[in-house]
Amino acid sequence: MLHLHIFSWVIGIILFIVSYISFTKTGAPKKAYKPLHMTLRLFLVLILFSGVWQVVEEFATATGSTHMLLTLKMICGIGVVALMEVTLVRKQRGASHKGLFWGTIALIIVTMALGIILPGGPISNMFVITK
C-alpha cells in the first residue's frame, strides 16, 4: 500500500501543477483543465484511501513510537489535499490564489519531509531504524 501511496502523491503533485498552469493569459481555463482536475480528484481519493489504510495498519500494530508524527503527517496530508482543491477552484473563479498556491507547496514539502523521516521512509531504511 505504501507504493500506491507514493505513486499517487507523485502523480497528484504533477497533476496539481499542470492543472494550475493550464489557464490562458486572460485567466480562462483551457479545454484540458476539466479532465486534469477530475483526474487530480481521482488521485486525491487514492491518496486519502491509501493514507488512511497506512494509518490504520500502523495504529493496529501499536508497537511503534511514532504515532504522534504519523498523526501530524496525516493532518498535513489532509491539509494538502484540501489546499490543492481550494487553490484550483479559487483560480478558476478568478479570486486570489497565489498565496494558497505557495502555501500548498510549502505544506507538500513539510508532509514529504515527515514521510521521509517516519519508519518505512527512505532515511529510516537507509540507517536501519526500526520501530
Swiss-Prot record:
Keywords: Cell membrane, Membrane, Transmembrane, Transmembrane helix. It comes from the Bacteria. The chain crosses the membrane at residues 1-21, 42-62, 69-89, 99-119. It is found in: Cell membrane. Pfam families: DUF1516 (PF07457). One of its GO terms (cellular component) is plasma membrane. InterPro entries: UPF0344 (IPR010899). It is a multi-pass membrane protein. Belongs to the UPF0344 family. This is UPF0344 protein Sca_0577.
